[in-house]
Amino acid sequence: EIPLRLVGSEMCIRDRVKNVKIGPSPAWMRERIRNAGMRPINNVVDITNYVMLEYGQPMHAFDFSCVNNGEIHVRLAREGESVQTLDGTDRRLSSSMLCICDTDKPVGVAGVMGGANSEIEGDTAMVLFESANFNGTSIRRTANALGMRTDASSRYEKGLDVENTYKAVERACELVELLGCGEVVEGIIDVVPRAISTVSLKLEPEKINALLGTDISRDTMEDILVRLGFTMEGDIIHVPSWRGDVEHYSDIAEEVARFYGYNEIPTCFAGGNTTSGGFTPLQQCERQIGQTCRSLGMDEIITYSFISPGYYDKIRMPADSPLRDSLRILNPPVSYT
């Protein structure tokens, strides 16, 4: 049994871990990874990348011998901490960045890239698999601040299915055993620092039909939703974990409309009464003055707007820019001088 401890934070929803030994990477997996536009590294890293391509769930593998005291902490970085990532670059972390650490140091930037100090190498004998679900906003801000957008961060920032973490790590361990490249150690450590919220909505056919302008029956709506993976419990619709975009009854209406068929929704002209436009007393006065002046032989012209030279400074235009050589008037308004 391996003494492993995870310390969760508000930004980390779930971590699932299993440990394997390293073996050679099969040729077919390397070829499939290349076809997906990625570079094969070694057997363990290839498995994590392969699972990410299959499930859309990023994973990471640590050299367990490099994890001090066998403990993994998921926490915010301390001001001034730094870590060398797998690309060989030293990254200076701020207190708003989530990181993966052991008892002494960061071993990776959570959701972005692992650290070189726990990299899988040829002499690695024990591996720690991590499958996590991090807050997408936090990961996006960290990736932007560090100037590194990775395959993992681009997936996290869009939001992932919380329930997929377990499936991904199980698939990774299945590949380890299936390919005979290691021995899976029993035990999964699952940390859920806060309850996973689920979305439930009330099915209101009248409201949906009023929004869509249709007359779809309740049974048809329920059939569409069930086929899309929603579960029904009376009037309550339970939204599946992978549908993070469904939060309001209008989202349910959209799902119903898409699968009922937009072509089945009747078209009609826009309703309502039209009224003739009018002018305000000031507009009527201006039009009357203009008409009188034109009848007296005057010409009406529309010129370019006058602006103060100070606007160039507001938009930070260089002092030697040729665009500053505009036409100057001899009697500018007082506010422009």
Where are these regions (language model features)?
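Single conserved hydrophobic/aromatic residue that forms the stacking wall/gate
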Residues: 1-8, 13
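Hydrophobic alpha-helical scaffolding
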Residues: 16-23, 38, 86-89, 103, ...
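Generic, well-ordered alpha-helical scaffold segments in large soluble proteins
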Residues: 16-20, 32-39, 47-54, 58, ...
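Short, glycine-/Ser/Thr-/acidic-enriched flexible segments
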Residues: 22, 49, 57-59, 79-81, ...
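Conserved mixed alpha/beta core segments that line enzyme active sites in large multi-domain catalysts
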Residues: 26, 30-35, 42, 48-117
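Flexible, glycine/charged-enriched surface loops at secondary-structure junctions
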Residues: 40-47, 176-191, 233-234, 267, ...
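Mobile "lid/hinge" segments at catalytic clefts and subdomain interfaces of large enzymes
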Residues: 100-196
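Extended, well-folded interaction surfaces typified by the phenylalanyl-tRNA synthetase beta subunit core
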Residues: 201-336
